[in-house]
Amino acid sequence: ETNPDKAYAVNAVGTRNLAVMAQSIGAKLIHISTDDIFSGTEDHSYNEFDTPNPRNIYGKSKLAGEAYIQSFCSRYVILRSSWVYGIGQDFLNTVLSAVKDPSVNELTVSEYEYACPTSASELARIIEYFIKILEY
């Protein structure tokens, strides 16, 4: 949010460059996007048919990247993940560590944010699947 130009350079223009290059060599592009392309204001889980409505720079820049892929590349898969967790430091492990730490007396979290945590190993398995299939 503090550097929108950089966010767009990486998430939109950088993604456009990858899409153009993938198309030029006939490669399949597998893109990891985010659930931040949605507003988060609906009372249901989002799916690929819901209309994107990002509320922050990150989501807007990632959505712009998705649009570039759809415009410039004919073989692509867009995977939208949220709260990726696995071995190492990530949001979910940070919260779990804080909950287990007896020296932490208070933990403040949003009561309005809902997400579906994504296992890093499961995400890797899905990426491998899309690499191998020929339909995309």
Locate each region found by the language model.
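Short acidic donor-binding/metal-coordinating loop in glycosyltransferase active sites
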Residues: 4, 34, 81
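Short amphipathic alpha-helical segments
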Residues: 2, 19, 43-44, 90-92
